[in-house]
């Protein structure tokens, strides 16, 4: 019987990072290992329901130190605009003393981290191992975060001529550039210094990029598999959404969710709404209020609600995304190609239309649309603007069962989904991942 280990987990202060770390923690706990999960105090309540093994996974709350310019009480990226992520990153670095005190007191065998590049050096001082666990796509790391890499420039030996940035991606690169220098240093330093690199992906989707990363860093790369969240069967789909969706034919409704960190300018928000209207299809749009508006209703185009009242809803709050995707009426999922959302998309039966906003989302979108041809990307102008016509046309192209594009992406998506949900694939990844940890670290 293999020895059991005690792991620390210290993810970036974003729910899009903390939740995938917790999914991995659940898999480790399921195999009898212990996990101490370090996170901001306020985040604990929102994550507790994701902890399936509370006897084996213990939350260790941290006090987020004040940083000049960071709003008081801000602890996660959900509390701030993307432009302030750099300051939250500084706050994360200032928790080092708290993290080291926990290490001294609890003596873990290894530490999983992503942005805290100082973890490997600290771990070595205490004779424990470090794992750089990357939850963004391997394509992003391979393209942008290899030694000597530059934002937007394909590195020598990069294994794809399709999964890359183009002229019209300036908007995504500009958004990241505010945060990029610090982020690049954090991730590459962590990858260089850690004992093992772990990626949340599978070779069936990103194998050539994982191999490239391993060669670039001269390190063992372990894959966890996609780490789909456990379905929450304790709560059914909210009645308001079940009632609304059940009023339409199977596979006829478009569900659009641009991501929790995306706050659109009012004109782009309205164009998004008008694009959904222009499809002529029933839709549910879950989106944050536009910049300058306190509610989504304030930002809607004039006369919009009246025109779509029988077939469309714009909602500014949280929704049960996995349960909505599983509803038989949903036929198309329009999303930002975030690292968690895209895996949910791939194992659903919905057609996929992608509107990436950040650089990592752009690269994974290209992987989906051009390497695998399982989705369609909404065209943009250089400014990042997408028109109602471009959105509507993309949606209609995949929803039309008789169109060449619709047939192609539907067929390819079905094939890829069959691979990802094949019996034993995901459990096999977890088994091999744990074996790899024990062979290389414990």
From Swiss-Prot:
Disulfide bonds: none annotated. Keywords: Glycosyltransferase, Transferase. The keyword Disulfide bond does not apply. It holds the Pfam family UDPGT. Signal peptide: none annotated. Its EC number is 2.4.1.-. UDP-alpha-D-glucose binds at residues 260, 319-321, 336-344, 358-361. One of its GO terms (molecular function) is UDP-glucosyltransferase activity. It comes from the Eukaryota. Belongs to the UDP-glycosyltransferase family. This is UDP-glycosyltransferase 79B7. It comes from Arabidopsis thaliana (Mouse-ear cress). The gene is UGT79B7.
């Amino acid at each position: 019987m293999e020895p059991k280990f005690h792991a620390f987990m210290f993810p970036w202060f974003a729910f899009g990072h903390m939740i995938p770390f917790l999914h991995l923690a659940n898999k480790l706990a399921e195999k009898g290992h212990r996990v101490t999960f370090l996170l901001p105090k306020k985040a604990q309540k929102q994550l507790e329901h994701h902890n399936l093994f509370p006897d084996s996974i213990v939350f260790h709350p941290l006090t987020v130190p004040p940083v000049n310019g960071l709003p008081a009480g801000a602890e996660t990226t959900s509390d701030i605009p993307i432009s302030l992520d750099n300051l939250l990153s500084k706050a994360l670095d200032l928790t080092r003393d708290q993290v080291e005190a926990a290490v001294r007191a609890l003596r873990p065998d290894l530490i999983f981290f992503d942005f805290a590049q100082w973890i490997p050096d600290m771990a070595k001082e205490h004779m424990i191992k470090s794992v750089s666990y990357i939850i963004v796509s391997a394509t992003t790391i391979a393209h942008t975060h290899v030694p000597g890499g530059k934002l937007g420039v394909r590195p020598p030996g990069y294994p794809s001529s399709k999964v890359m940035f183009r002229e019209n991606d300036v908007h995504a690169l500009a958004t990241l550039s505010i945060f990029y220098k610090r982020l690049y240093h954090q991730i590459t330093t962590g990858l260089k210094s850690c004992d093992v690199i772990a990626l949340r992906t599978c070779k069936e989707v990103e194998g050539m990029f994982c191999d490239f990363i391993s060669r670039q860093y001269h390190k063992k790369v372990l894959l966890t598999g996609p780490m789909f969240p456990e379905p929450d069967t304790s709560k059914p789909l909210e009645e308001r959404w079940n009632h609304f969706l059940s009023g339409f034919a199977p596979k006829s409704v478009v569900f659009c969710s641009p991501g929790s960190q995306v706050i659109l300018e009012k004109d782009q928000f309205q164009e998004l709404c008008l694009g959904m209207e222009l499809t002529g299809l029933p839709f549910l749009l879950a989106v944050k209020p536009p910049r300058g508006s306190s509610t989504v209703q304030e930002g809607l185009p004039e006369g919009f609600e009246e025109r779509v009242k029988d077939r469309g809803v714009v909602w500014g709050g949280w929704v049960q995304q996995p349960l909505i995707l599983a509803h038989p009426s949903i036929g198309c999922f329009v999303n930002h190609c975030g690292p968690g959302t895209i895996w949910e998309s791939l194992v659903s039966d919905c057609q996929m239309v992608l509107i990436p906003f950040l650089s990592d989302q752009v690269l994974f979108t290209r992987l989906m649309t051009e390497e695998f041809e399982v989705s369609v990307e909404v065209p943009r102008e250089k400014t990042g603007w997408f028109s109602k016509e471009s959105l509507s046309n993309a949606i209609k192209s995949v929803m039309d069962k008789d169109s060449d594009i619709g047939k192609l992406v539907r067929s390819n998506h079905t094939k890829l989904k069959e691979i990802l949900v094949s019996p034993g694939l995901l459990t096999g990844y977890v088994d091999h991942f744990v074996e790899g940890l024990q062979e290389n670290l414990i």
